[in-house]
Design a protein with these regions (language model features):
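N-terminal hydrophobic targeting/anchoring segments and the immediately downstream early-domain regions
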Residues: 1-16, 20-23, 27
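General structural signal for secondary-structure boundaries
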Residues: 14-18, 106, 126
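N-terminal active-site wall of soluble small-molecule enzyme domains
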Residues: 36-116
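A very general structural signal that marks isolated residues within well-ordered alpha-helical segments
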Residues: 43, 119, 131-132
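Hydrophobic or amphipathic alpha-helical targeting/insertion segments
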Residues: 116-122
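Conserved small/polar residues in nucleotide/adenosyl-binding loops
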Residues: 124-133
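Hydrophobic alpha-helical segments, chiefly the membrane-spanning helices
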Residues: 136-141
């Protein structure tokens, strides 16, 4: 058996006893199974159309090793901040597989995306609270 499982009352992650991982890394600890991640990605990938792009939401977990693994298996990335964008680029992500989206982007974040030729930028803007209420303020304000 592989991935993450319990056998005879003991937790195993990719056939490594959980107690041994706890001894080596201490607790609490985050332990991930690359096999589970790869298998789950394959389940999605096998169902998509050829032109579809699966984009991992980096805000869910920006661990560099996980991002590198996802790069290796062909994943795209959904990023919402400049730091998430930097991590994906550091992991070796294909700039054509990065979607930079969301609200409240700084000029620095947008410039960084442009300088790195991130072509898929979905930027949503809305007036600031001050601008939205300005029309309701007395003219002397």
């Amino acid at each position: 058996m592989t991935g993450i499982h319990v056998k005879e009352g003991n937790l195993f992650v990719e056939n490594i006893l959980g107690a041994e991982l706890a001894k080596k890394y201490g607790t609490p600890a985050f332990i991930y199974s690359s096999e589970v991640i790869r298998n789950n990605y394959a389940l999605y990938s096998n169902q998509k159309r050829e032109d579809d792009l699966i984009c991992y939401a980096v805000k869910a977990n920006s661990n560099l090793n996980i991002l590198k693994m996802l790069v290796d298996i062909g994943s795209g990335f959904d990023v919402v901040s400049g730091n998430e964008l930097k991590k994906c680029l550091l992991a070796g992500a294909d700039k054509n597989k990065i979607v930079f989206s969301g609200v409240a982007k700084s000029e620095e974040e947008i410039t960084h995306a442009i300088e790195n030729e991130i072509l898929s930028c979905l930027l949503y803007t809305s007036p600031s609270p001050r601008d939205r209420t300005r029309s309701r303020m007395p003219s002397s304000a």
